[in-house]
Design a protein with these regions (language model features):
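Non-catalytic substrate-recognition and accessory regions of acyl/acetyltransferase enzymes
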Residues: 1-97, 104, 108-120
Length: 120
């Protein structure tokens, strides 16, 4: 089975997404306008035990997620996930640029669990 991540745009079309390890530049974008709910440069999210990933449509950062692989518990813990302000239900005024970001990040957590030899 192949993992083909996507979200839906405002016209309800599937848009392919790439998911890669978060870079310091990705984290810094959360401190610029339009501000994200959370600064991903914060001490809490800087925890080295967390695997952090960036979801992008082309070069556009649409979401960030932090996961904690807990092999002794046989799970991947989703520590935190957040959509860009334009697609964040608490910030977008009811008209998100992209939909399905939460489901995408949960699905990626399941993939990360399977890839880590856990049970998904």
């Amino acid at each position: 089975m192949q993992f083909r991540p996507f979200v839906y745009d405002a016209m309800n079309r599937q848009v392919p997404v790439t998911i890669e390890p978060m870079t310091p530049q990705d984290a810094a974008l959360t401190d610029r306008e339009p501000l994200w709910q959370t600064s991903w440069t914060s001490e809490y999210l800087a925890n080295e035990d967390y695997e952090k990933y960036a979801a992008k449509v082309g070069d556009e950062l649409i979401a960030l997620a932090a996961y904690e692989v807990l092999p002794t518990a046989l799970v991947v813990h989703i520590v935190y996930m957040e959509a860009q302000p334009e697609s964040n239900p608490t910030l977008d005024g009811g008209t998100p640029k992209y939909r399905g970001i939460g489901r995408l990040l949960i699905a990626y957590g399941i993939k990360l669990s399977i890839d880590s030899g856990l049970t998904g």
